[in-house]
Amino acid sequence: MLEQDAQVTDAELADAVAAEEAAMEELLVRLVETETTLGNEEPGQIVMREAFADAGLEPRDLPLDTDAIRGSIYSSPFSWDVSGKANVVADLPTAGSTGRSLVLNGHVDVVGPASEQLWRTPPFRAVRDGDWIYGRGAGDMKAGLAAIVGAVRGLRRLGLSPLAPVQLQSVVEEECTGNGALQCVLSERRRDAAIVTEPFPAAITLAQVGVLWFHVDIAGSPAHVGEAGEGVNAIEAAYRLLSGLHALEAELNDDPPSPFDTFEHPINLNVGVVRGGDWPSTVAAECSLSCRVALYPGTPVVELQQRVEETVAAAASTHPYLSAHPPHVRYDGFACEGTTVSADEPLVQTLGGAWERLTGTAPEHAATTATTDARAFIQHGIPAVCIGPHAESIHGVDERVLWPSVVQTAQVLALFIRDWCGLAG
């Protein structure tokens, strides 16, 4: 095999990837129909091991190492057991060492379907309707994993190998901590760039917010409902705290920095889970709120944690019972800062060029009010961006992905690998 660039055109690469469309769709269907919510990721990783092997690669596991993760300043706290969880990675055979190395990353885990009764089709059954494929995780982000595999299958079809290391990663825990991608960064050799195929169509993400999950435990005083005035309802007391937290949210949105000043409301507080009480005829003795709030790049997580704690304490001080029995704030899940990448990065320029040549239109440079695993690479000095298929209703009802955009993403990745790494055959 010659250590030189193969003379392969954009059209030849795109056609080779398109020839793998059936295999990509089959993989996406299998992934969607394999439930991979938190704690149930392994069945999806079995599918990804098989997909990597079917593409001619040798998959290997990267188990989550609790001590290594918790020892990193970039980890998010977690209270659950991660033993037995593993990322799955595969390295492309190389034809030389003259190019730039690369990671192609996607996450296999998904959020739950919420109320299945609201879905037009069962959430864990992949249903194609015209150019759309429905199902939980179809867009976020199992289609991105299918695109990664499709790009590699296209290269293998042409008998081409990169002139630098290229690693494919299927990671866990993107939806709750980001510790899966962090484990890859901690365990594997440094790469020159990373692309995460999150569903950001026709846009390269250069900035993303950080995210903080926090939980507020509120103690009330139980009583028989016939003597409700003798007790303190913890659920009702929670309203006082929520009012204060939404006031904090408004403050955080007062003067957003660029590029988040293009959003009407870039910092979103979400009360995602409320648990409280144990009996309809008993004044609720306890209530817990599980919340998510965002933070701008440059804001330390500890600074936002302090503001949350001060806000909860201030709101509690105005309540006759909570002022003497203050709520407790704890952290479990996301605790990550925002990140940015320069538009002048060679990664951004090269990826934009590949997209424009394939589609005829230059991709936008975008910011997102969510967080992604690109963060783990950026925090370790590895330029990383997101670009991927067109998806709708992610985390919502009737999530779906536009199938032609999945094929297009795979084609762009193949062109990018040629431009970034070089190819030989």
Residue ranges of model-derived segments:
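Metal-dependent amide/peptide-bond hydrolase catalytic core
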Residues: M1-E12, D54, L206, W213-G425
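Hydrophobic/aromatic beta-strand patches that form the interior of the parallel beta-sheet core
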Residues: R60, L102-L104, A193-I195, F214, ...
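Active-site catalytic microenvironments for nucleophilic, acid-base chemistry
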Residues: T34, A151-L158, G244, L248, ...
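Short, conserved micro-motifs enriched in small and acidic residues
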Residues: D131-A146, G159, V232-E236, R400-V407
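Acidic/histidine-rich catalytic neighborhood of metal-dependent amide-processing enzymes
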Residues: I133, G139-W213, C421-G425
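Short beta-strand segments
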Residues: N105-G106, S170, I195-E198, D217-A219, ...
